Amino acid sequence: MVKCTPLLALTVIVSAGSDALSDPTVKRLAKLATINQAPATQSNSDSKRVLRASDVPNEVAAGESRSPKSLWPWEVEDKLAPLKEKLISTSADDLEAGGSAKKNALPMTWRWLWQNQIETKKTPIDEISKEVQTAMDLISSKATHEELNKAGVSVSDYVKALKLTLPEVDVDVVNRGMEYNIHLGNK
């Protein structure tokens, strides 16, 4: 009998495709794949651990609280979304605190950036301004907000560049970008 490991379960789910998510067997495999197992007693035995029947969470009635073990991947993403938005958000009040114009205040949430970068991706490369290209280069090199300010990058150019480079930018860089926006607003 083949033991179902999380890797095997994920492999089967990926092979089955998204249309198969309604199948009860695929749902069960998805649960097996998302279980958060307790750490093994020996470090070298981590790779040898397999799921037991007792590891599989029982179905929970609607309205009841659910263990983190039984969360689907998209439910985990939904729970993390507010944290991401808090991490990468700047409000009109933040920018206005330094007496800056309110026009610089943008809804800079993770979801907003992610959705809007898709449209910006359609911009032909020859239509990207020199200023935006400079900002993109600085973002890629993880420039500090002082370096961005010295290069004369405006908030709007920075936002355009950020939307174009978001898939390749790590959270630390995006964080620095938000600090840069606030820095400009407080000048």
Curated annotation (Swiss-Prot):
Short motif (RxLR-dEER): ranges: 49-66
Keyword field: Secreted, Signal, Virulence
Domain of life, source organism: Eukaryota
UniProt subcellular location: Secreted; Host cell
Signal sequence coordinates: 1-20
GO cellular component, one term: extracellular region
Protein family per UniProt: Belongs to the RxLR effector family.
Additional note from the record: ATR39 has 2 polymorphic alleles that are highly conserved among Hyaloperonospora arabidopsidis isolate. This conservation is in stark contrast with other characterized H.arabidopsidis effectors ATR1, ATR5 and ATR13, which are highly divergent. The presence of amino acids Glu-168 and Val-169 in ATR39-2 blocks recognition by host defense protein RPP39.
Free-text comment about domains: The RxLR-dEER motif acts to carry the protein into the host cell cytoplasm through binding to cell surface phosphatidylinositol-3-phosphate.
Known role: Secreted effector that acts as an elicitor of hypersensitive response (HR) specifically on plants carrying defense protein RPP39. The allele ATR39-1 is recognized by RPP39, whereas the ATR39-2 allele is nor recognized.
UniProt protein name: Avirulence protein ATR39-2
